[in-house]
């Protein structure tokens, strides 16, 4: 009983804790954990197999081997528990204490802890302000260090070599003290006066000017302060006592054949003990210094190896040449403690088997093999057998079950009814990878899976396996049923669209039955109901695709749930009429009155969910599936070789292309085109030939000519099986059919470049040997890619989950007024993503004003936009909306529901406790395997787009120019003179229809604000040269134009005109290196002219290779080109695509040759140049100048004297997200990352809601750099959690003190995960050693806010159903801490009664 009480008491102790603190262990602490000192390296006696006394497995120290039995066997049984045997000294207790009793080793000489020594930055080095190199020399006995200078002229911490030390000894005698080894470091650390050090450093920080010194001081100050605050003492980084792990955690297992398998730790401990004992003996014998030193060094090395083998020097290896696994290796990596045992555990009550199709199942069911079910539900069956009296004991029940009699199966049926099981398919990439189903018992050994959930599991039936888990407790069953049931997971959390969508054969069947066929049996018949039409079809009186008239009854359900019935006669087909029979009431017939491809089916299911709710949708989906299977069977669609019709025009098209190629080759031979041009042109020719063949083939396949009932020939969609499969979306695509019946087209070489000769054959004709060989590369690459992709995609998901795991919805509304501005996504003349798709399910941040009114509010702020409101927005032609976003949410920890908006998987406002972070990570990571791995070489076909030279508009409307600088030339046309000009076309309702970037020097046909009709060409420019445009009228004057030094004259072969070319400075003779050729504009009197509106002279510096076609003294008008700079034909840049691009964006990597943005607003000028760089000087409005050095090879977009805005592009290139954040702010960087990531997914046809990407961006912006610390404890330049700074500032404001200011910092996902507040979460992610070292030194306390930390300590997570539990715990704790007032008055009677009750309740046993 006592044991039980003790046990219960212990249980309570560990349960209630609010945080986990990590720190350095002091020697006293290690001794207090220990149950005795391990003195001998022996493990167990080889004859008796009993543990040796005082050895590594000693029973005296660590506890008995067998339960309640001492080693010598004097005391056995439970009644002796707690007795310590006087003979062998072993306490009689449970043997499991050997898992938690520790021992210790008293080290004969102190030893430095390798983590604090070698884990960079070295903590010991920082504390002592010495270099790691020096410290190692002291530790490993190469030099002395002065610990007590005394009255000498030596400095404390000065390093002395052996000879120097001897000299000093002669000079000063024993006035000073210098030591080597860990003792020296120990005494130096012990001497540190932290308060004094901190004061000194703070003072120095105020006075120092050098940046490097300040950085170094800040680092050291943070470390010393964290020691000061955390009650860790610096000298504890040196070990004097070494703890010994409990023996059952480093077991010694007997193998058969009398050998033993042992944990590597035992070897490592043995080494330490051996060397320690030898050192003790040597010290007792007063051995020569050099021997003792060597032994001490060896001891240091063996302790290093025990703690972290291989960190310093060569790893110690065991007998089989494999490095021994040290304590650090035990916890880090995929196989370490964190990831193997704490985050991922194996569970009981589970089984796995192959899956097969269950076409007859309902959506909420799965087929479970009887054998498996019996095994999984055994305990329940036993219980039921006893309850029914069929078995008296568990043993008897067991016998019955083993016999597998009839009554057992009946009972199993009863047990299983209404008891859901979880089905999981690895890899579980998103939360739909585990769903709950009700089991149905089946014969056989394979699990049956409902076909509609295959998409969510990404399962197919080619041998996939799935695992079954049984939720045991009633709570678990409830959760499985209400949250995880497959019927509750109809919408995908990634984009809010149905994921339970029929595919493949079902789609084909539905498509086949909803197609119409001209002149089919029974055309133009009239039916009084859909039922009658079905009857006629079953009787064979009418064909399935016949066009007939049917009387349809339709129910319309209004918003207020009122129903109106309408009956009318509709012309439709028999198949669609039959399909209408399975539609739920209230769904409009228009949804199925068309050929049902995959898209249309999805639309119908979506509409059903929004109109009628979840129950009807599930039934409808099931019925669709049954019907689809039935009619797919009836259709008899199959593929035969004649279905792949080769177009007759193919031969002529190929021949024409070959002739063109021949012509190009002849031109190349004659030297008229370069090799590169020939290559590009040939590839263009073949690409377009391929397109034409494909087009001819599709036209041929998709239409049939038939005779209608009137005897006329008409075209109808073909019933060719191959075409039907592709058209319905069941299987295959136009691109694949092209390879079957068109031509295979161009192939790539292994290095990614395209081979000039295409494969003109297709698979139906067959390939010859060469063609086959060329195409093998593609097949091989596909397989290699897939393998790489899976690993990389998994790693991306892991990093995303890790950064976002602690983001949970914690409150209803944070009251934030901020948000992001959302506009439709338009590229060129196409709307890529309409506004409604981007704002659906978001909350409005600022009132939406109806366009064209003076402030009539269309939708007020804080309203959730649903489908109806989005229709309203579209009708009113709103073209931008401010929506709330997680990024601007002001909740301290977590986010609020209003800023997140709709829960995509449920279709209503998100609830509290929803783990939006993990959901976002899964939604982005799950499609990762569909993305490509390769980088694209843009060459050939793609580079044509780069050299466009005009803009042709596709819509009618008004022109609007944004951030445009332009001049009007002599012909009254607009000439653009800035680089970031955008031209948008706006329709009558004020909606943006298209937008285009205009290059510098483009000539516009119309002015800003002019009307334009579609098809007009509005802007022209020369794509091959870059003009320099004048902004004033005047006379040209050349400066620094010296022939042969800075310029050369060239005459054009064709025209005979001469032009001046500027020589590249690198190629000029030395005399010309410093010349800066310029064109200057002067008035007729020779005075300088100024650029209008400024006092900057109108002079244009000319870049290398610029061509000037004017003569000195020529007159120029506004908008003329003074010079032209030839553009390199746009080089084929590799575009990083697919997965690597997404990873780069989330890691916030600065791209190579990033764009240079203006740091301040002002006027630009050039300062003095250095060897490889130019000096840009931007003069601000207040006269301050900002300087920046730019490499000379960078092509600048801006001329001297131009005004630029902060954040404007000075030199082109990919923009760096860090620059965007610094110069333009949070909203633009969020938009940039969101759009760029979406771009990659859009190319693959994957839809992900913007919200998810914003959630990740929000987590990347968690940290800020302190710019001014005000009255706070932060240091300037320190990186701090934004939430902490905000909370601290709130406190400072309340106290009327100065607040701290900070700049947001964008961290990549790996960096941000490692920089989380929670050290447990960071350590379980990556770089375990570094994270734990840092945390221990700082004495960090993990508050257990996130999900990962709680999983690791074995609690419910603070999300989902665990959220309420944590809330309740917090509330209870607050109530406990609240000052108790009334309860103090207790009358003695009740107190006595309570005490008596308590005493009676507890039975103290013997």
Curated annotation (Swiss-Prot):
Keyword Methyltransferase: no
Binding-site residues for Zn(2+) 1, renumbered to this chain: 70, 72, 85, 88
EC id: 2.7.7.6
One GO MF term: DNA binding
UniProt keyword terms in alphabetical order: DNA-directed RNA polymerase, Magnesium, Metal-binding, Nucleotidyltransferase, Transcription, Transferase, Zinc
Residues bound to Zn(2+) 2: 814, 889, 896, 899
Any one cellular-component term (Gene Ontology): DNA-directed RNA polymerase complex
GO biological process: DNA-templated transcription
Cofactors required: Mg(2+); Zn(2+)
Cofactor: binding comment: Binds 1 Mg(2+) ion per subunit.
Annotated residues for binding of Mg(2+): 460, 462, 464
Catalytic activity line of the entry: RNA(n) + a ribonucleoside 5'-triphosphate = RNA(n+1) + diphosphate
Family: Belongs to the RNA polymerase beta' chain family.
PANTHER family on file: DNA-DIRECTED RNA POLYMERASE (PTHR19376), DNA-DIRECTED RNA POLYMERASE SUBUNIT BETA (PTHR19376:SF54)
Subunit-structure text: The RNAP catalytic core consists of 2 alpha, 1 beta, 1 beta' and 1 omega subunit. When a sigma factor is associated with the core the holoenzyme is formed, which can initiate transcription.
Function: DNA-dependent RNA polymerase catalyzes the transcription of DNA into RNA using the four ribonucleoside triphosphates as substrates.
Protein name: DNA-directed RNA polymerase subunit beta'
The organism of origin for this protein: Psychromonas ingrahamii (strain DSM 17664 / CCUG 51855 / 37)
């Amino acid at each position: 009983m006592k044991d039980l009480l003790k046990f219960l008491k212990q249980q309570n102790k560990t349960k209630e804790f609010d945080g986990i603190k990590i720190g350095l262990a002091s020697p006293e602490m290690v001794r207090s954990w220990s149950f005795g000192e391990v003195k001998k390296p022996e493990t167990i006696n080889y004859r008796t197999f009993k543990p040796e006394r005082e050895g590594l497995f000693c029973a005296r120290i660590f506890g008995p081997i067998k339960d309640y039995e001492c080693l010598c066997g004097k005391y056995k049984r439970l009644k002796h528990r707690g007795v310590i045997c006087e003979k062998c000294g072993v306490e009689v207790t449970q043997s499991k204490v050997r898992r938690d009793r520790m021992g210790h080793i008293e080290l004969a000489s102190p030893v430095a802890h390798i983590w604090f020594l070698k884990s960079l930055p070295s903590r010991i080095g920082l504390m002592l302000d010495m270099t790691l190199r020096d410290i190692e020399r002291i530790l490993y006995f190469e030099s002395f260090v002065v610990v007590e200078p005394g009255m000498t002229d030596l400095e404390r911490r000065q390093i002395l070599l052996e000879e120097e030390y001897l000299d000093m000894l002669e000079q000063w005698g024993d006035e000073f003290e210098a030591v080597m080894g860990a003792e020296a470091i120990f005494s130096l650390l012990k001497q540190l006066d932290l308060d004094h050090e901190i004061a000194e450093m703070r003072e120095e920080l105020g006075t120092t000017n050098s940046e490097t010194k300040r950085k170094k001081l800040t680092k050291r100050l943070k470390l010393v302060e964290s020691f000061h605050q955390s009650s860790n003492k610096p000298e504890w980084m040196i070990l004097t006592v070494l703890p010994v792990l409990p023996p059952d955690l480093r077991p010694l297992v007997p193998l058969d054949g009398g050998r033993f398998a042992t944990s590597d730790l035992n070897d490592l401990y043995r080494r330490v003990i051996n060397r320690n004992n030898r050192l003790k003996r040597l010290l007792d014998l007063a051995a020569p210094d050099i021997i003792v030193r060597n032994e001490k060094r060896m001891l240091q090395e063996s302790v290093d190896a025990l703690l972290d083998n291989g960190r310093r020097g060569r790893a110690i290896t065991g007998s089989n040449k494999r490095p021994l696994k040290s304590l650090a290796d035990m916890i880090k990596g995929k196989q370490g403690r964190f990831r193997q045992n704490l985050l991922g555990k194996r569970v009981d009550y589970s089984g796995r088997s192959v899956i097969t199709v269950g076409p007859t199942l309902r959506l909420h069911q799965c087929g479970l093999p009887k054998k498996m079910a019996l095994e999984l539900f055994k305990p329940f069956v036993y219980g039921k057998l006893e309850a029914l009296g069929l078995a008296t004991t568990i043993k008897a029940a067991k016998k019955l079950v083993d016999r597998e009699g009839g009554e057992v199966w009946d009972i199993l049926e009863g047990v299983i009814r209404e008891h859901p099981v979880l089905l999981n398919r690895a890899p579980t990439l998103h939360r739909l990878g585990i769903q709950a189903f009700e089991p149905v018992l089946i014969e056989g050994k394979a699990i049956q899976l409902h076909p509609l959930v295959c998409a969510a599991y990404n399962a197919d039936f080619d041998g996939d396996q799935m695992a079954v888990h049984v939720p045991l407790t009633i709570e678990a069953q409830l959760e499985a049923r209400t949250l995880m049931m497959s019927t509750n997971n109809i919408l995908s959390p990634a984009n809010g669209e149905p994921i339970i969508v029929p595919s493949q054969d079902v789609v084909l069947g539905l498509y086949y039955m909803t197609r119409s066929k001209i002149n089919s049996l029974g055309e133009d018949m009239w039916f009084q109901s859909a039922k009658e039409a079905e009857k006629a079809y079953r009787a064979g009186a009418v064909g399935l695709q016949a066009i007939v008239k049917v009387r349809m009854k339709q129910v319309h359900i209004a918003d207020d749930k009122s129903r109106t019935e309408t009956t009318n006669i509709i012309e439709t087909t028999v198949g669609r009429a039959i399909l209408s029979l399975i539609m739920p009431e209230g769904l409009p017939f228009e949804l199925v009155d068309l050929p049902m491809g995959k898209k249309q089916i999805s639309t119908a299911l979506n509409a059903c969910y929004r109109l009628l709710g979840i129950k009807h949708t599930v039934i409808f989906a099931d019925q669709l599936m049954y019907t689809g299977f039935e009619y797919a069977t009836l259709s008899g669609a199959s593929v035969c070789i004649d279905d792949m019709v080769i177009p007759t025009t193919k031969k002529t098209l190929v021949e024409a292309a070959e002739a063109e190629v021949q012509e190009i080759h002849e031109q190349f031979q004659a030297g008229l085109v370069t090799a590169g041009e020939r290559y590009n042109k040939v590839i263009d020719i073949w690409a377009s030939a391929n397109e034409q063949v494909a087009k001819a083939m599709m036209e041929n396949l998709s239409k049939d000519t038939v005779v209608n009932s009137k005897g006329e020939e008409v075209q109808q969609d073909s019933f060719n099986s191959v075409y039907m499969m592709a058209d319905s979306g069941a299987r295959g695509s136009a691109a694949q059919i092209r390879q079957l019946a068109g031509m295979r087209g161009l192939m790539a070489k292994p290095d990614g470049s395209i081979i000039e000769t295409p494969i003109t054959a297709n698979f139906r004709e067959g390939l010859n040997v060469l063609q086959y060989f060329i195409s093998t590369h593609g097949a091989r690459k596909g397989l290699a890619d897939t393998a790489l992709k899976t690993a990389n995609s998994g790693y991306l998901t892991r990093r995303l989950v890790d950064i976002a795991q602690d983001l949970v919805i914690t409150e209803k509304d944070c009251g934030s007024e901020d948000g992001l501005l959302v506009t439709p996504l338009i590229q060129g003349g196409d709307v890529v993503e309409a506004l409604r798709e981007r704002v659906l399910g978001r909350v409005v941040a600022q009132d939406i004003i109806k366009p064209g009114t003076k402030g009539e509010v269309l939708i007020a702020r804080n309203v959730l936009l649903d489908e109806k409101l989005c229709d309203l927005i579209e009708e009113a032609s709103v073209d931008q909306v401010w929506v709330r976003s997680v990024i601007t949410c002001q909740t301290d920890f977590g986010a609020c529901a209003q800023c997140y908006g709709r829960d995509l998987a449920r279709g209503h406002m998100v609830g509290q406790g929803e783990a939006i972070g993990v959901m976002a990570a899964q939604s982005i990571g799950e499609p990762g395997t569909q993305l490509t791995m390769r980088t694209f070489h843009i060459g050939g076909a793609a580079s044509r787009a780069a050299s466009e030279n005009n803009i042709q508009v596709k819509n009618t409307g008004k022109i609007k120019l944004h951030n445009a600088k332009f001049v009007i030339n002599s012909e009254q046309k607009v000439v653009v003179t800035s680089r970031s000009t955008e031209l948008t076309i706006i329709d009558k309702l004020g909606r943006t229809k298209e937008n285009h970037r205009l290059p510098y020097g483009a000539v516009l046909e119309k002015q800003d604000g002019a009307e334009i009709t579609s098809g007009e060409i509005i802007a022209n420019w020369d794509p091959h040269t870059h003009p320099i445009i004048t902004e004033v009228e005047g006379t040209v004057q050349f400066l620094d134009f010296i022939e042969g030094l800075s310029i050369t004259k060239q005459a054009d072969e064709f025209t005979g005109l001469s032009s001046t070319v500027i020589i590249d400075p690198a190629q000029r003779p030395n005399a010309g290196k410093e010349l800066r050729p310029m064109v200057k504009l002067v008035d007729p009197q020779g005075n300088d002219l100024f650029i209008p509106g400024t006092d900057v002279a109108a002079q244009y510096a000319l870049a290398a290779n610029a061509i000037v076609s004017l003569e000195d003294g020529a007159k120029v008008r506004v908008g003329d080109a003074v010079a032209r700079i030839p553009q390199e034909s746009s080089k084929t840049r590799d575009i990083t695509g697919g997965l690597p691009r997404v990873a780069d964006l989330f890691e916030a990597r600065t791209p190579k040759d990033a764009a240079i943005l203006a740091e301040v607003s002002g006027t630009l000028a050039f300062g003095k140049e250095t060897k490889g760089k130019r000096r840009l000087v931007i003069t601000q409005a207040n006269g301050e100048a900002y300087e920046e050095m730019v490499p000379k090879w960078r092509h600048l977009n801006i001329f001297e004297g131009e005004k630029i805005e902060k954040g404007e592009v000075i030199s082109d290139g990919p923009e760096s997200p860090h620059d965007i954040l610094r110069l333009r702010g949070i909203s633009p960087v969020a938009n940039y990352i969101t759009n760029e990531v979406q771009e990659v997914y859009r190319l693959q046809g994957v839809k992900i809601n913007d919200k998810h990407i914003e959630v990740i961006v929000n987590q990347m912006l968690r940290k800020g750099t302190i710019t001014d610390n005000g009255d706070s404890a932060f240091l300037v330049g320190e990186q701090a959690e934004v939430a902490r700074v905000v909370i601290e500032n709130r406190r400072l404001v309340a106290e009327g003190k100065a607040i701290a200011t900070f700049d947001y910092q964008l961290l990549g996902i790996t960096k941000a995960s490692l920089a989380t507040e929670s050290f447990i979460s960071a350590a379980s992610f990556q770089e375990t050693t570094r994270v734990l070292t840092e945390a221990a030194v700082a004495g960090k306390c993990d508050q257990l806010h996130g999900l990962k930390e709680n999983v690791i300590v074995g609690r419910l997570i603070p999300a989902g159903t665990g959220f309420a539990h944590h809330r309740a715990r917090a509330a209870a704790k607050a109530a406990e801490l609240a000052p108790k007032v009334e309860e103090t008055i207790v009358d003695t009677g009740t107190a006595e009664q309570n005490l008596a009750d308590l005493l009676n309740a507890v039975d103290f046993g013997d």
